[in-house]
Amino acid sequence: PIAGSMVLAAILLKLGGYGIIRMMQILPMTKTDVFLPFIILALWGAILANLTCLQQTDLKSLIAYSSISHMGLVVAAIMIQTPWGLSGAMALMIAHGFTSSALFCLANTTYERTHTRILILTRGFHNILPMTSTWWLLANLMNMATPPTLNFTSELLIMSTLFNWCPTTIILLGLSMLITASYSLHMFLSTQMGPTLLNNQTEPTHSREHLLMALHLVPLMMISMKPELII
């Protein structure tokens, strides 16, 4: 069920990050070097999840692995124990909550019309449902953290924190962001561009679907314009 996926990606996945933040406040102040294995594992896990995204053919699996990779960055940022890292982690959790939920919602609208989640079989939607393609484009741009979105602000804060702690981490972060951009564009091009493979008549999009997407992306854009609300 799509509602379960949306709640899981938007709220439940963030509870782990919230739990780590709360535990960090309870524990006595420790040197960041103690958390070095966890930081390296989180960054390496983010890259592996991103690489897994590149070889996915199932739309929902791709979005799910994308969520996992972003949570790796959140864990690494929290473990650094700096105000910037904490702000970046909180901002990324909120931004990615909106984005991943919107992507799952879009995946469901596509599935309801094609009855398949295979990327290559859902192509050509920009000719049939141009407004839905616009929502796909906006959601993917937010997922790959293009400015001026909150995703970009949060990833910039996390990148600054990790670079300040250890300059070598910029290699892992840069690689992670490059792969994120690659699979986000691949997902958009695979589902929207090219000739359509549908022979039957496609049902038009409903107002409730557009309202649902607007309620995901408009608040995110508004927070992006005034990030002081959460940072």
Swiss-Prot record:
<feature type="transmembrane region" description="Helical">
    <location>
        <begin position="118"/>
        <end position="138"/>
    </location>
</feature>
<feature type="transmembrane region" description="Helical">
    <location>
        <begin position="169"/>
        <end position="189"/>
    </location>
</feature>
<feature type="transmembrane region" description="Helical">
    <location>
        <begin position="61"/>
        <end position="80"/>
    </location>
</feature>
<keyword id="KW-1278">Translocase</keyword>
<keyword id="KW-0830">Ubiquinone</keyword>
<protein>
    <recommendedName>
        <fullName>NADH-ubiquinone oxidoreductase chain 4</fullName>
        <ecNumber>7.1.1.2</ecNumber>
    </recommendedName>
</protein>
<keyword id="KW-0472">Membrane</keyword>
<dbReference type="GO" id="GO:0042773">
    <property type="term" value="P:ATP synthesis coupled electron transport"/>
</dbReference>
<comment type="function">
    <text>Core subunit of the mitochondrial membrane respiratory chain NADH dehydrogenase (Complex I) that is believed to belong to the minimal assembly required for catalysis. Complex I functions in the transfer of electrons from NADH to the respiratory chain. The immediate electron acceptor for the enzyme is believed to be ubiquinone.</text>
</comment>
<keyword id="KW-0520">NAD</keyword>
<feature type="transmembrane region" description="Helical">
    <location>
        <begin position="34"/>
        <end position="54"/>
    </location>
</feature>
<dbReference type="GO" id="GO:0031966">
    <property type="term" value="C:mitochondrial membrane"/>
</dbReference>
<dbReference type="GO" id="GO:0048039">
    <property type="term" value="F:ubiquinone binding"/>
</dbReference>
<dbReference type="Pfam" id="PF00361">
    <property type="entry name" value="Proton_antipo_M"/>
</dbReference>
<feature type="transmembrane region" description="Helical">
    <location>
        <begin position="84"/>
        <end position="106"/>
    </location>
</feature>
<dbReference type="InterPro" id="IPR003918">
    <property type="entry name" value="NADH_UbQ_OxRdtase"/>
</dbReference>
<dbReference type="InterPro" id="IPR001750">
    <property type="entry name" value="ND/Mrp_TM"/>
</dbReference>
<dbReference type="GO" id="GO:0015990">
    <property type="term" value="P:electron transport coupled proton transport"/>
</dbReference>
<feature type="transmembrane region" description="Helical">
    <location>
        <begin position="1"/>
        <end position="21"/>
    </location>
</feature>
<keyword id="KW-0813">Transport</keyword>
<dbReference type="GO" id="GO:0008137">
    <property type="term" value="F:NADH dehydrogenase (ubiquinone) activity"/>
</dbReference>
<keyword id="KW-1133">Transmembrane helix</keyword>
<keyword id="KW-0249">Electron transport</keyword>
<comment type="similarity">
    <text>Belongs to the complex I subunit 4 family.</text>
</comment>
<keyword id="KW-0812">Transmembrane</keyword>
<keyword id="KW-0496">Mitochondrion</keyword>
<keyword id="KW-0679">Respiratory chain</keyword>
